Swiss-Prot record:
Residues covered by region (Globular): 688-786
GO biological process, one term: motile cilium assembly
Entry superkingdom: Eukaryota
Name the record gives this protein: Kinesin-like protein FLA10
Source taxonomy: Eukaryota, Viridiplantae, Chlorophyta, core chlorophytes, Chlorophyceae
Subcellular compartments: Cytoplasm, Cytoskeleton
Cited InterPro entries: Kinesin-like_fam, Kinesin_motor_CS, Kinesin_motor_dom, Kinesin_motor_dom_sf, P-loop_NTPase
Main location: cytoplasm
GO CC, one annotated term: ciliary plasm
Annotated binding of ATP, by residue: G97, Q98, T99, G100, T101, G102, K103, S104
GO molecular function, one term: microtubule motor activity
């Protein structure tokens, strides 16, 4: 078992290239990517460059060409990471690349046939295979969750309302997590695969020109594996050992991330919602690239994890307590050269990220120990009931449960009656102590009741007794019958409680998976084991070849550095070869520099286009604000606005008391209550105004709303001369101290053109209200209604 604390390790990066698709073949596209699987090298030719220019070469931990199988990718890339997660490490596998390069195929694949299953379903099967092969001394608890990030909103794909926006939280113990995220305990492969398919149906997908089933969101499927020694095994350890030496809960968390692909609008042909989704996807992937660059740079003291929901959730996976594997997916066609090079460059940089993984022992959110303790407690209760079940039982009083001792009644009755009652109790208790069936116990109770009744009747019939004694005997007979019924009820209740305890223990134990049992039970088990052995041997051989290749490269470099030459000609030849290699590298770097400049220019143009779109939306919102809210009230509103960096949202103080919110509640209340007293409601809301005109008409503007513009609280419309004077005065004097920031509403008013000499525009402003209303973002309208 590896130590709980280890040193740093770099992110493992593998590259997978898909084959040319049917459309690319029909268009006559050529393949520009060559892959050396044994050397772990990818070479990309520039289709626009001269034939003499050498291809760009990149070396990674592992590469997979278009002939590789899904199982090969899983065995070589994912299996070692899953083994570490079962030992208690955190792990992350995420697919990165351009849209349409096969990321979802790599991560999810197809359920049938089995050869096309991706990393996620193969991980399910492998996790439960490992648990099945365990010796049986450990207990496992496996949980799963599934979420997506759509348009920078975190959604629970397994929740009842999968479109509900979830909240991100952060704590020192758990790190960044999603509040109230649904989790399901899974006991086998089939259950976990059902969870995957249920969430997959709720995920956002859409068609573009590059991919008919394009993922429009980032998804994260999380498997949490808890492991602990069984209670019996922990109790059987040596007496000299400490109690908790071998009874730690180890929790490994595996994140399987399927990122949405980066895309260019001119290639995808995205419009409308697809275009908005593409902008959000590109922004989050840009934030991911910035985080990778900052981590590799090492000089930056600030890592911009908070720039995106994606980077916040992957914070531990990039530079934190996680073992991470990045699968970079690329396309082989010449028209994807720019995107392929961009993906390979990011992947090449990600190799230098250093993580510091460690085993997670006894975390506070572990559920397995809670399950164990609850099962132990329930078993102790059941054992106590079984051990004391034959003891005397108290008659229930006030509906309470029976206790394990007799409460004697003090009554002035004949000693013979007490003797009969004691005899009946003794017979019932003797029967309960012996392990007999329910039918036999009922029969014994009936016999005891009959005998007691017979003896008591004989006492009543005895003529030698006084009338008072006979009455006491009759009362005792009646009480004895009630007591017998109470005993029977107590016994039945005890049986029901025992059944409930047994059912609860069985349910709790059913959630815990114990090794030592073959859960698959397949006929071809031996054949499968043989294939696994062959596959493991092939993996070891591949790893040995990779290590040997790297060793030879290092030895060759060392020989060149320490070479001693027998003659001057030999030295000239060696130096010439070295110079030729260096010149080729120089030419390659020179060409790469030109490519980087082109890529930077494209990214800059894309960001400028996004900036223009956002600016257009901001100007529209500013126009709406300027049309409907007087300048002074804009200043007042902005004074009560606060930016929440954690949630990336604006909050306004006392927004529930705003006129629109009150009016909405009033309308809803009026709809629910048809007999609503309008007069009383108007009296209650006499100081609540639903528009600035009502407010100023009531004369409240001069008392409460005196803004920086003076006068009656900014009563003038923003398009009028008075409104412009107020606005200009507010811009000259008001607002916040210091430089202008994004919360300065004066800058928003500046973006609206209120030209004095343009009468047509001023005349068109009132007419544009309906048009502006229709172009408001639906989410804004929904939030307003809320």
């Amino acid at each position: 078992m590896p130590p709980a604390g280890g040193g740093s390790e770099s992110v493992k990066v593998v590259v997978r290239c898909r084959p040319l698709n049917g459309k690319e073949k029909a268009d006559g596209r050529s393949r520009i990517v060559d892959m050396d699987v044994d050397a772990g090298q990818v070479k990309v030719r520039n289709p626009k460059a001269d034939a003499s220019e050498p291809p760009k070469a990149f070396t990674f931990d592992q590469v997979y060409d278009w002939n590789c199988q899904q199982r090969d990718v899983f065995d070589i890339t994912a299996r070692p990471l899953i083994d570490s997660c079962i030992e208690g490490y955190n792990g992350t596998i995420f697919a990165y690349g351009q849209t349409g390069t096969g990321k979802s195929h790599t991560m999810e694949g197809k359920d049938e046939p089995p050869e096309l299953r991706g990393l996620i379903p193969n991980t399910f099967r492998y996790v439960f295979e490992i648990i099945a092969r365990d010796s049986g001394t450990k207990e496992f608890l496996v949980r799963s969750s599934y979420l997506e990030i759509y348009n920078e909103e975190v959604r629970d794909l397994l929740g009842k309302d999968h479109s509900k926006k979830m909240e991100l939280k952060e704590s020192p113990d758990r790190g960044v997590y999603v509040k109230d995220l649904s989790q399901f305990v899974c006991k086998n492969y089939e259950e976990m695969n059902k969870v995957l398919l249920a969430g997959k149906d709720n995920r956002q997908v859409g068609a573009t020109l590059m991919n008919q089933d394009s993922s429009r969101s980032h998804s994260i499927f999380t498997i949490t594996i808890e492991c602990i020694e069984k209670l019996e095994s922990a109790a059987a350890q040596k007496p000299g050992a400490k109690k908790d030496d071998s009874n730690h809960v180890r929790v490994g968390k595996l994140n399987l991330v399927d990122l949405a692909g980066s895309e260019r609008q001119d290639k995808t042909g995205a419009t409308g919602d697809r275009l908005k989704e593409g902008i959000k996807i590109n922004l989050s992937l840009t934030a991911l690239g910035n985080v990778i660059s900052a981590l590799v740079d090492g000089k930056s003291g600030h890592i911009p994890y908070r720039d995106s929901k994606l980077t916040r959730l992957l914070q531990d996976s990039l530079g934190g307590n996680t073992k991470t594997v990045m699968v970079a997916n690329i396309g082989p066609a010449d028209w994807n050269y720019d995107e392929t090079m961009s993906t390979l460059r990011y992947a090449n940089r990600a190799k230098n990220i250093q993580n510091k993984p460690k085993i997670n022992e006894d975390p506070k959110d572990a559920m397995l120990r809670q399950f164990q303790e609850e099962i132990k407690k329930l078993k102790e209760q059941l054992a106590a009931r079984a051990a004391g079940g034959g003891g005397p039982i108290t008659m229930p009083s006030g509906g309470g449960s029976p206790t394990q001792k007799i409460v004697e009644r003090t009554e002035e009755v004949d000693p013979d009656i007490d003797a009969i009652k004691a005899q009946m109790r003794a017979e019932l208790e003797a029967k309960m102590k012996s392990d007999i069936s329910t039918e036999a116990l009922d029969k014994a109770r009936e016999e005891a009741e009959a005998a007691a009744k017979k003896q008591l009747q004989a006492i009543i019939d005895d003529q030698g007794k006084t009338e008072a004694q006979k009455k006491a005997a009759r009362d005792a007979l009646k009480k004895q019958a009630e007591e017998a019924r109470a005993i029977a009820g107590a016994i039945e209740k005890e049986k029901q409680e025992k059944a409930v305890l047994e059912s609860r223990i069985k349910e709790m134990e059913g959630k815990i998976v114990v090794g030592g049992v073959n859960m698959l039970e397949k006929v071809d088990e031996l054949k499968q084991k043989s294939e696994d052995i062959k596959r493991e041997a092939a993996i070891r051989k591949r790893q040995e070849e990779e290590a040997k290749r790297r060793l030879e490269e290092l030895q060759a470099a060392q020989v060149d550095a320490d070479a001693k030459f027998a003659s001057l000609d030999e030295e000239i030849n060696v130096k010439s070869r070295q110079l030729k290699k260096l010149f080729e590298k120089y030419q390659g770097k020179k060409g790469e520099l030109a490519d980087l400049q082109e890529q930077f220019q494209r990214e800059r143009e894309g960001m400028l286009e996004d900036y223009r779109i956002l600016t257009q939306q901001i100007k529209l919102k500013n126009l709406i604000i300027a049309c409907f809210i007087p300048p002074d009230y804009q200043d007042k509103i902005m004074q009560h606005c606060h930016w929440q960096d954690y949630d990336s949202s604006w909050n306004i103080d006392c927004i529930a008391y705003a006129g629109n919110a009150v009016r909405t509640n009033q309308e809803l209340q009026a709809q629910e209550d048809k007999e609503h007293d309008a007069a009383a409601e108007n009296e209650r809301l006499k100081n609540c105004f639903f528009s600035y005109e009502q407010f100023e008409a009531a004369g409240a503007g001069s008392k409460q709303g005196g803004g920086g513009g003076g006068g009656g609280g900014g009563a003038a419309r923003p398009g009028s001369s008075a409104g412009r004077a107020v606005g200009s005065a507010a811009r000259r004097t008001g607002g916040k101290a210091g430089g202008k920031d994004i919360t300065d509403i004066g800058s928003l008013r500046d973006s609206v053109n209120w030209g004095d000499d343009d009468d047509k525009k001023k005349g068109a402003i009132p007419k544009a209200k309906g048009l502006v209303k229709d172009t408001v973002d639906p989410r804004l309208r929904a939030s307003k209604l809320k």
